[in-house]
Regions:
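Solvent-exposed beta-strand/loop surfaces of large extracellular or lumenal domains
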Residues: 483-507, 524-530
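A conserved hydrophobic secondary-structure block that centers on an alpha-helix together
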Residues: 126-202
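Hydrophobic core segments within long, regular secondary-structure runs in both alpha-
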Residues: 15, 22, 26, 34, ...
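Active-site neighborhood of glycoside hydrolase catalytic domains
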Residues: 189, 196-224, 234-308, 312-319, ...
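C-terminal beta-rich recognition modules with glycine/proline-rich loops and embedded aromatic residues
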Residues: 10, 212, 290, 356-364, ...
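Well-ordered alpha-helical scaffold segments within catalytic/enzyme domains
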Residues: 18, 83-96, 145-160, 193-205, ...
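Low-complexity, Ser/Thr/Pro/Gly-enriched N-terminal "stalk/linker" regions
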Residues: 1-78, 103-123, 161
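Carbohydrate-binding/catalytic loop surfaces
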Residues: 45-72, 120-139, 190-202, 229-263, ...
Length: 633
């Protein structure tokens, strides 16, 4: 059974660092993204998402719209994620104009639904006869999942049922196809599984639970399914290898999986649903599989920034310890999915391993996925960039040195928006008698067990976290694994505490003040020697933030810099940081080589002070070199 549940988004009102990000999403990101979805911006990649729904609605009315679809086969999913982000934002801060915009969008979506409940603009517009014939590539179930999530969030935010009822009808259609009529199959891109569990908890309809369970339980049982499916059709979307079961996470029944393989986002979305289902049904065998997969990812396949999926080939996991910096794929959505997975594991087992990884992924890769102005986005998050190579040559084309305004495949931008807007669901949890503080997020929190508190902190730049207790009880606060020392004060008096799997448990009463002070030192991180790409390199971090070195702060050349072993590192300020951030200065040397490609003459050594900035803000001051892992001398 679950040890705790994440709070509902409505229970958290953000302030401080998270509050500023939620304000940015509310005031800039959500309106900007709607303008993109509605094709209103001339200088960014066209989305056509809303027009696809309009054209599908016309097709439902009997009009000829075969040329009316534009974009990826899963383009509808952007609508679900954007509505979900808007819904969370409405919970955080009511906005009648935004609500009106969402309602109008929902009207268009509802008009695109067919009488039998089917809802997918690609097939409604292009070819109704081919629906449900290409689960591997066509992603009908994936797009349905994101629309379900959007509908659930909007219902919880507003109480309005229209979108929820549309998706309930759609799920009944899907249930009829896969359960009642017993058609074989499971999603090529997992997502609907986790969405069905959300819908089940809202509606109580056990058909949702049964359908989720069928998709998970049948996955990988018939390892020839995608091959057999391909043999029955004469068309393809991507030309995927239907026999690559490791890429599709269908190489074995899910309870037998040992290694995280294949497309990274698909994998962690699947594992999220598996972990959630294990908690919902007390399936310990399923949870044991999740634990094996978690260990494989975090102990062998995760970047220091909380990024996963190291290879561009298939946006996938590579082999163990293959974590290149300059060709890293490290998709933003994959780190978001890793946070989803961590949150569900944390519900089943309160362990700081999971919340530590949520924090690492969020404050580094997820935040790096969006420009500080909220209008440009990274799909790929390399740990080293060299202009003229990155984003240019064939081996590095994916690792762009600057964030684009949008993408033809725009899964990441609305994903970032919905995660930031729902941050409370990851920061805080609860059970009958305990309030859990998993991440340090300033603001007011109300728990369903009656506890109430206000968190005050400058985190991630300040390391004192104050909890002012309005309604008391038992409080569980995570002590991050990176904090080698910490101090706990209750009403200004030190409290002796024992860490239990990374958490301290303290009884607090109405009116109490609890202060947790964490380690604020700058730390040198050394990679395991089995990571071939990182031999002789180090990375710096402070708190949850990994630091990088950009050319703009270092005479436009970070490749020639080596950090001094044992060198002094200090907190510093630089005038042109694009946000309220803190830099670090560290003793280093610059190597200057003689002319020629190779030489018998060693480089000249100059003593310098190198400047590092938080990884999440890189690329906000123009195109220049960037490196996380630095040579050490």
């Amino acid at each position: 059974m679950k040890k705790q549940n994440m709070i509902k988004n409505s229970g958290y009102k953000a302030e401080g660092f998270i509050g500023q990000y939620q304000k940015l999403v509310r005031e800039v990101v959500i309106p900007y993204q709607y303008s993109v979805l509605n094709d209103e911006l001339p200088d960014v990649e066209k989305s056509h998402v809303i027009d696809n729904f309009r054209n599908a609605a016309a097709a439902v009315r009997g009009e000829d719209t075969k040329d009316g679809f534009y974009g990826m086969v899963f383009q509808d999913s952007d609508a679900g994620k954007w509505i979900e982000a808007a819904a969370y934002s409405l919970q955080n801060c009511p906005d009648k104009e935004l609500e009106k915009t969402v309602d109008e969008f929902i009207d268009i979506i509802a008009d695109a639904q067919e009488e039998n409940g089917y809802l997918n603009t690609y097939f409604t517009i292009k070819d109704k006869e081919k629906r449900w014939t290409n689960l591997l590539e066509a992603h009908e179930l994936y797009t349905a999942g994101h629309l379900i999530e959007g509908a659930c969030a909007y219902y919880e935010a507003t109480g309005k049922r229209k979108f929820l009822d549309v998706m309930i009808k759609n799920v009944k259609h899907i249930y009829n196809h896969f359960v009642t009529e017993n058609h074989e199959g499971f999603p090529g891109h997992p997502e609907i599984e986790l969405a069905l569990l959300k819908l089940y908890r809202i509606t109580g309809d056990r058909d949702c639970l049964e359908l989720c369970k069928k998709f998970i339980d049948t996955r990988g049982v018939n390892t020839d399914f995608y091959k057999q499916e391909k043999a029955k059709r004469d068309w393809t979307v991507w030309g995927n290898n239907a026999e690559d079961n490791y890429y599709q996470q269908s190489n074995a029944p899910v309870r037998e999986l040992e290694k995280a393989t294949g497309h990274a986002v698909r994998a962690v979305y699947l594992y999220t649903a598996m972990a959630d289902l294990s908690g919902e049904t007390d399936d310990e065998e399923l949870f044991a599989a999740c634990e094996r997969l978690w260990q494989d990812i975090t102990e062998r396949k995760t970047y220091i920034t909380g990024a996963i999926g190291s290879t561009v080939h298939g946006e996938a996991f590579s082999t163990d310890y293959d974590l290149p910096s300059d060709t890293a794929y490290a998709e933003t959505c994959a780190s978001i999915g890793l946070m989803f997975f961590a949150a569900r594991m944390l519900e089943k087992e309160v362990d700081g391993r999971y919340s530590d990884m949520m924090e690492r992924a969020f404050y580094n890769t997820v935040l790096a996925g969006m420009q500080l102005d909220g209008k440009r986005f990274f799909y790929v998050n390399p740990l080293e960039v060299v202009p003229g190579i990155s984003g240019v040559i064939a081996t590095h084309w994916h690792a762009r040195p600057q964030r684009p305004g949008w993408y033809g495949c725009a899964c990441c931008p609305p994903n970032v928006a919905r995660l930031i807007s729902s941050f409370g669901q990851y920061a805080y949890g609860e059970n009958e008698d305990t309030a859990f503080c998993h991440l340090f997020a300033g603001g007011k929190v109300e728990f369903s067990n009656g506890m109430k508190l206000t968190c005050e902190t400058r985190y991630p730049y300040g390391f004192a976290v104050t909890y002012k207790i309005e309604k008391g009880g038992k409080l569980a606060v995570r002590i991050p694994s990176w904090s080698e020392s910490y101090l706990v004060l209750l009403n200004k008096k030190p409290v002796r505490t024992e860490k239990i799997k990374g958490y301290v448990y303290i009884e607090v009463a109405d009116g109490d003040t609890l202060i947790i002070t964490l380690d604020d030192s700058i730390k040198t991180n050394y990679p395991n020697t089995v990571i071939h790409d990182l031999s002789g390199k180090v990375a710096l971090s402070r708190g949850p933030l990994v630091y990088c070195f950009e050319g703009v702060d270092n005479d436009n050349d970070v490749l020639s810099i080596a950090l001094k072993s044992g060198g002094k590192a200090i907190v510093t300020e630089i005038s042109d940081l694009p946000c309220d951030s803190i830099a670090i200065g560290v003793e280093a040397v610059r190597k200057t080589s003689p002319a020629g490609l190779y030489s018998f003459t060693p480089p000249l050594i100059e003593q310098i002070a190198a400047v590092g900035v938080p990884y999440y803000i890189w690329g906000n001051r123009g195109e220049n070199q960037m490196r996380v892992w630095m040579d050490e001398i």
